[in-house]
Amino acid sequence: MENRDTILEENRSYWSGRAAGYSAVNRWELSTAQRQKWKDCLREELVRQFPARAMDALRVLEVGTGPGFFAILLCELGCDVTALDLTPAMLAEAKKNAGELAGKICWMEMNAEALTFADASFDAVVSRNLTWNLPHPDAAYAEWARVLRPGGLLLNFDANWYAYLFDEKAQAAYEQDRRNSAEQGVRDQNLESEGEHFDVMEDIARRVPLSQLRRPAWDLARLHALGLHARADERIWQRVWSEEERLNFASTPMFLIIARKGQC
């Protein structure tokens, strides 16, 4: 079996090269109605789990912050935010995007699969579009559970990205998404955002474990094994995606993993 530490370094290199382009996507989100949609979603989940707690009393960790989208929204909500990423280039973009809020967020370069925090350090751990790309997602979930306080909340937004590399039906649906985007005159986010890096990402996706596993079933099984109470909202995309995203990624709907530590 391939040494997945090699994949980790390839990820670091790939996302360093994608930092500027991915940051542009996040800035677009911050400048549109997507900003409020996502902020409302995060607020609702936090309030549901912590109805008696003020936002400024919640210590929240964002894993894989990228250009800082979630970190910025959580800071605007008033949370005490720590945001980590594997790549310094992404953290640099995140700080720029955060503007005046940058100084209120603790930015850290760190591996999502090997956190350096003490046990029970955070009330909530959040992540978006990260888990699928990890060489050791089982280790990542174990770490995220470890740093959660009793009664803590894990929110993980992800999708079956690159499942089309292993499934003929998924491949056909993916190709239909490309045709639909072209026919509707909508920019193809899947191809445009990655540009010349597309083949590199597909190569990595072929070698990480989650591209060929059924999700969110795998995630729920793993979290239950860790002792967390977990469920999946497989319609979250209907709430947070733009019309353009719905067209681009129709065959790969986003899901939300909601897991709680130590309580039902």
Give the ranges of each region predicted by the language model.
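A short acidic, Gly/Pro-enriched loop at the edge of an enzyme's catalytic core
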Residues: 113-124
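A short glycine-rich, Lys/Arg-flanked "PGG" loop and its adjoining helix->strand segment in the class I
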Residues: 138-150
